[in-house]
Structure formats: structure tokens, C-alpha cells
Amino acid sequence: MSSSPAQTPSRRPSLLGGSMIIAGTAVGAGMFSLPIAMSGIWFGWSVAVFLLTWFCMLLSGMMILEANLNYPVGSSFSTITRDLLGQGWNVVNGLSIAFVLYILTYAYISGGGSIIGYTLSSGLGVTLPEKLAGLLFALAVALVVWWSTRAVDRITTLMLGGMIITFGLSISGLLGRIQPAILFNSGEPDAVYWPYLLATLPFCLTSFGYHGNVPSLMKYYGKDPQRISRSLWIGTLIALAIYLLWQASTLGTIPREQFKGIIAGGSNVGTLVEYLHRITASDSLNALLTTFSNLAVASSFLGVTLGLFDYLADLCRFDDSHFGRFKTALLTFVPPTIGGLLFPNGFIYAIGFAGLAAAFWAVIVPALMARASRKRFGSPLFRAWGGTPAIVLVLLFGVANAVAHILASLHWLPEYR
């Protein structure tokens, strides 16, 4: 099943646009979990994990592109999976995508309650329980998503602009406060890092998730594999650079031993920002970090819930009337909000669970799709580099992530706390 190449538009979309779509999808509030989840392995090992994850996630994205090019422009991830791997794989893949969206919705309700509670407490002296803050946050976002997709688009655009400004200013402020002795943990010459390495993989994997947007880039650029692959390269490299800067800024400022206090405090966004404020003792930097964290959580929450909203509307065949959207909104927000009320400090655990499901649909499935695509089509337009060894590497990486999360959930892996 193939089609002729899409017609080249008179004015081709810019390479920057596609790159920003990839980087913007990958980078979100989940980055706040990274310093906490990787505090056990600290900076040097975390760089190695980031590089491995970036490489494997870039490869799996290229494999989706390879398979996608054999189908008409506009073919969805689900369509390609069903045709290449069969209905059974497609059902499991769809369930894993829904699981990721639901668990991330819960994560952002939890993270939103934490950072809103901290913001009100530190900025206005108002004490608001995290459960109530999370509930109000969920209601506000639900109202926007229910109202219209255009409302989400406009608000998210404003938030992204604010995020870029506040992140840039926050990082520039933190980089100047990095202490090499803290960054390289020279105060603990006998510290052991490697036992905590395996448990960090799912958190890192979640931070490089963009794979559902590869078919969208086909609509954006047409069948132009060189342009799409460059967008994947640039977008993922931007995400990698942001994460490395964030890791250096946090792990070079907060001593390793103090992360045990953050973990004991619930491992949430507000706790991390509070510790940074204590150490830097800068009200202006605290205001920037607090603003950035609020915007990051809110924009990620809007993006994820819009995706879940559209997915459920299509699955349940709800129409786009106000009542139809209301039914979809109930299905989208009620289950994760109940979870947020029952388990308000589940942000970092939810990110890990998202990594488990993402290991399936964003790593294992793309590798299997590339293998099936090569058997059927021979990949005449584009082939992800690395041949069969690359497919094996990506499959092993996906399985390792899934196993790591299962073992960590059973407490069979060492925990830094």
C-alpha cells in the first residue's frame, strides 16, 4: 500500500517549524522529575543515560518515518500499526497510548497541585491544601479544553512564550551558582552510583517522547524524508541540550544528600523549587523558577489533556456539540482527578509509569514496524540507519525500560532515599 509523493507546495514550511514541534512536544513539566529520579546516579552517569536515551529515541522516530513514508500523507500511527503488525498489536498499542495520556494527566494534576500550593504559600502567604489546589487546577484546565481546541491553542502559545523567557532567565541565574564540588559530588569520594542506574531509564525515556508527531510532520512537509529527519535531529538535540542544562543547574546547586529530603517530601515539583530557593536565597530567581514551573505544568497539562480528549471523543464517537464535549470532558478529567485527590504526591511515580507504556508504543512498536515495512516494501524512499543491528538495539532498549520499571515498582531495584 503506497502512494505517489505529495505535491510540493509553492512555499515549503521552514525546518525550524518542524524542529520546534518535536522539541516542544518532548520538553515539558516532566523535566522536573529528572533531577529527582536521577539523583542516585548523579551528573556523570545521568549524562550517559541521556545520550543513550536520546540516540535510541531518535532511532525509533526514524523508524516510524521509514514505515510512514510507505503510506498516504495523513495516515495515522494507528493505521500504519494495524496494517503492518495486525489488529492485535494495534489494540495493545492504542491501549498503551491511552494509558500514557491518562497517567500523564494524573501526573500534571499532582504536579499542578504541588506547585500552585507552593506559589500561593511563598508568594501570598496563603496556605491551600495540595488536594484542593490540584482539584481547582484540573477544573480550570477542563473548562478550557471543553470550550474549544482554539482556546487551548491560544493559551498554550502565550504560555510557551512565557516559558521560553522564564526558563532562559532561570537557567542563566542557576548556571552562575553551580559549584563544581557539588556537581561532581567530590564530597562523597566513596559514593556508589551504578546500582541506581536501571531505575532512571523510564523517566528519561518519557522526556524524549515525540513519536506521535512524526505522521503530523508528514502532513506538514509532505513526503520529504530529508527534511523530516533533519527536524527530528534538530528537535531532539534541542531537547537534549535543555535537559543537560537543567541537570547541571540543579545537580550543581543542590547537594546530593539533600535530594533525600526532596524524595521524602513527596518528590513533587513544588518541593524541588522550594529547595532551590532555600539554597540560592534569591527571591528574584525563585519568582522566575516558580513562574516557569507553573507555566510548564499548565502547558503540558493542556497539551496532554487535549490529546486525550480528542482520542476519547473519537473512540466513543461523541460529537463536537457542547453536550458531546461535556461528556468527553467528564471521561477525560474525572478519573485522573480522583487519582489526584487520593494520591496527591504521585507526580514522579506517574512519570515512571508513563515511561513503561511509552517503552512499548514509542520504542518496541516502531522497531517492529520498521522490520515489517522492510519486508513488505523494501523502504524505497528512506531507511533508518543501522540496519538490523539498530532494530535489535532499539528493541533491547525498549525491553530494558519496561523491565526496569516493573522491577522498580516491585522495589526489587536499589532506591536512593
Curated annotation (Swiss-Prot):
InterPro entries, per the entry: Amino_acid_transport_2, Trp_tyr_transpt
Biological process according to GO: amino acid transmembrane transport
Residues of the signal peptide: none
Protein name: Tryptophan-specific transport protein
Topology term for the membrane: Multi-pass membrane protein
Family listed: Belongs to the amino acid/polyamine transporter 2 family. Mtr/TnaB/TyrP permease subfamily.
Residues bearing PTM Phosphothreonine: T8
One Pfam family, short name: Trp_Tyr_perm
Gene3D superfamilies: Amino acid/polyamine transporter I (1.20.1740.10)
GO cellular component labels: extracellular region; plasma membrane
Segments passing through the bilayer: 16-36, 40-60, 97-117, 126-146, 155-175, 191-211, 232-252, 295-315, 326-346, 347-367, 390-410
Molecular function GO labels: aromatic amino acid transmembrane transporter activity; symporter activity
Function, as annotated: Involved in the transport of tryptophan into the cell.
UniProt keyword annotations, A-Z: Amino-acid transport, Cell inner membrane, Cell membrane, Membrane, Phosphoprotein, Secreted, Symport, Transmembrane, Transmembrane helix, Transport
Swiss-Prot/TrEMBL catalytic activity: L-tryptophan(in) + H(+)(in) = L-tryptophan(out) + H(+)(out)
Localization: Cell inner membrane; Secreted
Main subcellular location: membrane
